[in-house]
Every structure is written in C-alpha cells, then in structure tokens.
Amino acid sequence: MGKKKKIDKNKDKTVRSINNNIRSSVRKLNPILRGIVGKKVDVAIRDLQFSEKRITRDIRKTISSAVANAENNFQYDIDKLIVKEAYCGKKITMKRFRPRAEGRAAPILKPYSSVTIILSELNKVESHGTKS
C-alpha cells in the first residue's frame, strides 16, 4: 500500500492552454513569450496584436483559449487574469532537401514548437520583497 496523497487546499489555482504544433523555432518564440509574462491578459493580447512577428497570431490564439478556459471552466473574472507563465519547448523537426549544383542536396530544417500559457488571477499571485 502506498501513501495517501496530501491535498493542498491553499494551492494556487491556475488555468493553462497548450498549443502543440507551432511552425516556428524555440529561438524565435522565447523573446516574445518573455515579453508577456506578468502582464494582464488584455495588455498581453494588445502587445501581441501590434507586434510585427508572424508567430504572434498563434500565441494570441493560445492566450484567448486560456482565457476561455478560465471563464467557462473555472468562472474566473477575466479582467483580473494575468499571464503567470509562458514557455515553449521543442517538437519535431521536418527535414527537407533542396537540390543544389552538380547533383548535391542541401538539407532544410523546419522546426516545430509547443507553447504553454499559464494564467492566474491577479489577487492570487504572491508579491515578492519586503515592501508592501
């Protein structure tokens, strides 16, 4: 017999949304995701909307999905939601070949990534530091 799981009632409730197949590399996604962490959801969506990067459309959709999850599944107030975490990971890399001179071929790598967005309510995030 195993130990019983301890249930922490004070655990911070979060909402997450995962987009598993984004056609971009992790290197291009990371700076965008770092820019939205800690912001309110509407501010993050606005910042992504006015960004010139192609991939921000997919990130915006993922945030909108997380907001819908928070509103419909957990009845959170969407005005109080902030982006608690946003990170990405490597997925598959499609390998293609481009014909070159004298019968040679050059590889083309087409990377895919997964994006995870975690939202939390503003009053549930603990502040750090000694000043109030």
Question: What feature does the model see in each segment?
Answer:
Residues 2-87, 114-122, 126-132:
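Ribosome large-subunit tunnel/peptidyl-transferase-proximal elements
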Residues 19, 104-106:
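Short beta-strand/turn micro-motifs at beta-sheet edges
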Residues 32, 99-103:
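Short acidic (Asp/Glu) patches
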Residues 75-77, 98, 107-112:
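A generic structural micro-feature
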Residues 87-100:
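A short, conserved strand-capping beta-turn/loop at the end of a beta strand
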